[in-house]
Amino acid sequence: MPEARDRTERPVDYSTIFANRRRHGILLDEPDSRLSLIESPVNPDIGSIGGTGGLVRGNFTTWRPGNGRGGHTPFRLPQGRENMPIVTARRGRGGGLLPSWYPRTPLRDITHIVRAIERRRGAGTGGDDGRVIEIPTHRQVGVLESPVPLSGEHKCSMVTPGPSVGFKRSCPPSTAKVQKMLLDITKEIAEEEAGFITPEKKLLNSIDKVEKIVMAEIQKLKSTPQAKREEREKRVRTLMTMR
């Protein structure tokens, strides 16, 4: 029985192989003895094997599982180039870190979503008059920076809410007086809403009134006998430490 063709030993002329590789830029069929057990065999096309040196004039195809082209993926070496890695076609959209099934959508404008959230909040808190709170866009930045007040600003409440009904706290009488005065200020501001007042002016008026009330309460506390006694004890301690 004749010996199999894949076991036939042929002399290899390395100078001719190197010259053909440089001239044609094609992949050469190395001897079978040089193929390691890990490498996948290269299957040349039938009728494309020449008689000298085992040169392959056609395309090389490597077996790859799960391919729709009969299990082979053809590739070619670039003509006229040396030491270039073989680049195979990829099915993904690039060499990114995300997997191929991850949705890659462009950034969307979420302004309408934010407006819907703000509209729902306004309807739940103080939107009884049907006003819609909108998020300013880039074109409205210049309008917002203007000193002219926008519609719906006089409806904003910038004051401290009163204590909840049915909830009692143990607080000193001075604090109770301050809370009562704050409630009076809230009522005054509610009465002044008939006239047009900006939230900034309303806030400044509230701060001034609260500051005056607090300073008056502090002066009253300093004039009490207990406060005078504490002040005298503090001075005595300071003098004793200076001895």
Swiss-Prot record:
- Lineage, top-rank taxon, reads Eukaryota
Q: Share an example GO biological-process annotation for this protein.
A: defense response
Q: Disrupted gene: resulting phenotype?
A: Ectopic endomitosis during somatic cell division leading to gigas cells, large guard cells, and round cells containing large polyploid nuclei in cotyledons. Enhancer of the myb3r4 mutant phenotype. Enhancer of bon1-2 phenotype, leading to dwarf and bushy phenotype with many lateral shoots. Production of diploid gametes by skipping the second meiotic division; male meiosis leads to dyads instead of tetrads, and selfed progeny provides tetraploids (4n) and triploids (3n), but no diploid (2n) plants.
For this protein, the record's InterPro entries field holds: POLYCHOME/GIG1 (IPR034590)
**PTM notes:** Phosphorylated by CDKA-1 in complex with CYCA1-2.
Q: Which UniProt keywords apply?
A: Cell cycle, Cell division, Developmental protein, DNA replication, Meiosis, Mitosis, Phosphoprotein, Plant defense
The terms describing its cellular component in GO are: nucleus
**What tissue specificity does the UniProt entry give?**
Expressed in rapidly dividing tissues such as shoot apical meristem and young leaves. Associated with cell division but also with specific cell types.
Q: What does this protein do?
A: Negative regulator of the anaphase-promoting complex/cyclosome (APC/C) ubiquitin ligase required for proper mitotic and meiotic progression and cell fate determination. Involved in entry into both meiosis I and meiosis II. Prevents endomitosis by preferentially inhibiting APC/C(CDC20). Required for megagametophyte and endosperm development. Triggers mitotic cyclins (e.g. CYCB1-1 and CYCB1-2) accumulation. Confers immunity to bacterial pathogens (e.g. Pseudomonas syringae pv. tomato DC3000), which is associated with increased expression of disease resistance (R) genes.
According to the record's subunit comment, the protein's assembly and interactions are: Interacts with APC/C activators such as FZR1, FZR2, FZR3, CDC20.1 and CDC20.5.
Q: Which protein is depicted?
A: Protein GIGAS CELL1
